[in-house]
Amino acid sequence: MTQLAIGKPTPLGAHYDGQGVNFTLFSAHAERVELCVFDANGQEHRYDLPGHSGDIWHGYLPDARPGLRYGYRVHGPWQPAEGHRFNPAKLLIDPCARQIDGEFKDNPLLHAGHNEPDYRDNAAIAPKCVVVVDHYDWEDDAPPRTPWGSTIIYEAHVKGLTYLHPEIPVEIRGTYKALGHPVMINYLKQLGITALELLPVAQFASEPRLQRMGLSNYWGYNPVAMFALHPAYACSPETALDEFRDAIKALHKAGIEVILDIVLNHSAELDLDGPLFSLRGIDNRSYYWIREDGDYHNWTGCGNTLNLSHPAVVDYASACLRYWVETCHVDGFRFDLAAVMGRTPEFRQDAPLFTAIQNCPVLSQVKLIAEPWDIAPGGYQVGNFPPLFAEWNDHFRDAARRFWLHYDLPLGVFAGRFAASSDVFKRNGRLPSAAINLVTAHDGFTLRDCVCFNHKHNEANGEENRDGTNNNYSNNHGKEGLGGTLDLVERRRDSIHALLTTLLLSQGTPMLLAGDEHGHSQHGNNNAYCQDNQLTWLDWSQASSGLTAFTAALIHLRKRIPALMENRWWEEGDGNVRWLNRYAQPLSTDEWQNGPKQLQILLSDRFLIAINATLEVTEIVLPAGEWHAIPPFAGEDNPVITAVWQGPAHGLCVFQR
């Protein structure tokens, strides 16, 4: 039997050097680590890792080759009250594995036990890691490096974006390959998108509860192997990495960046009754935030919370991020529940992971976007992230919906959100682009559902409609659900136009939810995380070409307005913006606070957004000059010069002089 050499303690994971494979695993509290390799017949062979450098266990297996399947058994104390849950009867996934063979099914053998250990061996059914070798020709690929001020983000799900697309070959629909297909790239280019933000692509598992209900985790926010691509999005699991990189290379050639939504806040091991896949059995005490009674701090709502203040976990997270940038050429990350990244346990801007990212020559150069909250006390941290980060701006989302759909927002608040929420983000040298403006996202109503439903309809999720937020700031315009009279359809269309215009012509970085530009509906489901079906897949055959053209014209218009592209804070008298009332006069303090919802926003002294958010048709006197409405609010030919705009109820128009 081949013996393991000591090998070396870096890098983490399994790495083939042409003659064998070096294996490394972190565990500060383990007493012994066994490497378990499986031959073609499934026969298991065990080797003690002979090297132990600090908290890194390591060994080198001569003659091992790519394709080798492996896992770990980690020996140590079973002391739940102390946070230790070692159980060598359970085969564990390498946290740095690049490929996984097998499925994460709901099976009692994949549990370690709660109060007492479950000593039933699970190697026969446990997923295995696969040793991979990396040879890929990037040709002349280069990151687009789109300036933040020019960035337009499009948030999409890998499968849902293309699974029903009639112009993409059937055999690649819903896959990584489809992202790089010319049809999809041309669509994104024509729309004006500069960055494709993908929901999680790292391998994830469906929660046992969902599996028992016949559902699955669709969004992917339940990670199990952070270095491995989710194989279900590949035409072939063995070629997933190359398929993904082919798509990125094609998108880069078109000038489109790729941003990954990444989950560095919890794992698919869930709470103490959840499955045992990896971290809990490798070093539970180090990887997770543990309470004094040995249970988890559940600051994520998912049962556990990664301890990103622990040096080894910081190294793990940093290595993971560098892997996606260096190996896959991704252009940035959106961090789910990112307040966890700054917990020490209190939130700090100089938390260890933030500092590591700041000091990394690779990670400090890519786009970083935070979802700036978690569910723990002190978890709402909008505006408080380090300067390198942009942040999802929920202030903008709520203000835009309240202004256009609830009619209860003062002009002053609306203007503040339109101006990149400077009261929130203008600090520590940050620029307006730090505000990621959104009206909708994967989490919540789609844009169409915002104007068709007053209440969530999440019954299909199996929780009796208890899940999902009740604070939607939506307006069904008098009838719950899709369809209705011509008048109803037109009023809803006008509201959609108003929300899109507010999003795409405001200061900050706009993010558009895929499908909003052609009227996608989830039929009132505002938490469709477990709906891998036609509820979430974009139906391109039913897309509204008129709405798509309207959205594309707005993005094109945005790129013509210097005040929106220069990424500088607006200052009084700088010529970037003037705020005027319906008579083209500066607003008084009373008008800002209590005035009618009528406003004119003059940008770069040449572009005018006239707003009438009242219930009545209102005459708006435009500023001095020869003004004409411009696309998408008027045709290209024969512009009509006007000095007064008859503003329809809940309407707006953009003019140029």
From Swiss-Prot:
Residues 460-479 are annotated as: Disordered. Belongs to the glycosyl hydrolase 13 family. Its EC number is 3.2.1.196. The active site is at 336 (nucleophile), 371 (proton donor). It catalyses: Hydrolysis of (1->6)-alpha-D-glucosidic linkages to branches with degrees of polymerization of three or four glucose residues in limit dextrin. Disulfide bonds: none annotated. InterPro entries: GlgX_C, GlgX_Isoamylase_N_E_set, Glyco_hydro_13_cat_dom, Glyco_hydro_13_N, Glyco_hydro_b, Glycogen_debranch_bac, Glycogen_debranch_GlgX, Glycoside_hydrolase_SF. Removes maltotriose and maltotetraose chains that are attached by 1,6-alpha-linkage to the limit dextrin main chain, generating a debranched limit dextrin. It comes from Escherichia coli O127:H6 (strain E2348/69 / EPEC). Pathway: Glycan degradation; glycogen degradation. GO terms for molecular function: glycogen debranching enzyme activity; hydrolase activity, hydrolyzing O-glycosyl compounds. Pfam families: Alpha-amylase, CBM_48, GlgX_C. The record marks 443 as: Transition state stabilizer. The keyword Glycosyltransferase does not apply. It comes from the Bacteria. GO terms for biological process: glycogen catabolic process. This is Glycogen debranching enzyme. Keywords: Carbohydrate metabolism, Glycogen metabolism, Glycosidase, Hydrolase.
